[in-house]
């Protein structure tokens, strides 16, 4: 395709003196080695120009090599058995203790991205083991042949255009991820540029593309976020559909409740249009009036009881008016009974006076009278 070329690094041979060198390789992050001479043909001239530009390794590669070579840090980072790869054994401690000393940051993800820009690749997925054909134990001179890849401006423009097209085509508006263009300095620059962890995914992925063979073979890598945007739009569309169903269900429930309450309060339905907008309906006015009447009656009853208690006499704080009235009634009833008995006794006395006395009673009465007379003498 135009703007994208893949393939292995061509081997360049030239006539004259020269040495072995390495150049950054294909799209998978591998690198290949080729021979270049200082004179001779056109290929030799190109190789000589590359050696002049790659005479000094970048500080990032130098510091990384020193970390791997130092036996003091073997518990955190070290070579493998044959010295072709290096392994970060404890990423957390490595980022906390060593990265601030050498790279002025403590972000392990940034360190890994920086390795990717120099063509390092991860060997196994379950371990932080990285390899590069020009990064080997005892061959520090090969570091100058590791090229740092550049970010192509057309690739960034294509990524931005694809993201904009995906957003425009989607039905749901999604905030697009900003695309930040990082201008990477050439490999012989002394300033290290570490990609920040806040960089966009498009910019971080675009950093994989680069220049191969000192500019002779250029590869453009474009990484769009269109699939991610489509997936996000699909998820948001499903969420909107779910919320719409819930809203419809709640509206139906509200309508049923309103109808049920309207059946119990028929007057409210006629007066609904008279209520100001936003004012809630008073669905239970009768209950409120009833409660107010009950409260008023309780207050009046309490006042009456209080007044009655104030009018009755008390003994040691206890009302005795009711008991006194009961005693008066009992006394009145007893007096009436006594009166009845007296009347009955008087009637019996009158009846006994009319009865004729017996002779013995007369004699006895005479004797008694005589005795009384004798005593009187």
Swiss-Prot record:
Q: Where is this motif: Nuclear localization signal?
A: 323-327
Please give an example of a GO cellular component term from this record: nucleus
Q: Which terms are listed as keywords in the entry?
A: DNA-binding, Nucleus, Phosphoprotein, Stress response, Transcription, Transcription regulation
- Its main localization is nucleus
Q: What Pfam families does the record tag this protein with?
A: HSF_DNA-bind
Q: Matching InterPro entries, A to Z?
A: HSF_DNA-bd, WH-like_DNA-bd_sf, WH_DNA-bd_sf
From the Swiss-Prot or TrEMBL record, state where the protein is found. Answer: Nucleus
Post-translational changes noted in the entry: Exhibits temperature-dependent phosphorylation.
Record feature DNA-binding region, as residue ranges = 57-151
| Region of interest (Disordered), residue spans | 1-56, 326-377
What is an example of a GO molecular function annotated in this UniProt entry?
sequence-specific DNA binding
Query: Gly residues: which segments have biased composition?
Result: 14-51
Which terms under GO biological process does the entry name?
cellular response to hypoxia; negative regulation of DNA-templated transcription
Disulphide bond pairs: none
Q: Where is the composition biased (Acidic residues)?
A: 331-340
Region annotation Hydrophobic repeat HR-A/B: residue ranges? 220-265
The function of this protein is:
Transcriptional regulator that specifically binds DNA sequence 5'-AGAAnnTTCT-3' known as heat shock promoter elements (HSE).
Subunit structure and binding partners? Homotrimer.
Notes concerning its domains: The hydrophobic-rich region (HR-A/B) corresponds to the oligomerization domain.
Q: What does the sequence similarity comment in the record state about its family? A: Belongs to the HSF family. Class B subfamily.
> What protein name applies here?
Heat stress transcription factor B-2b
Organism this protein belongs to: Arabidopsis thaliana (Mouse-ear cress)
Question: Gene symbol?
Answer: HSFB2B
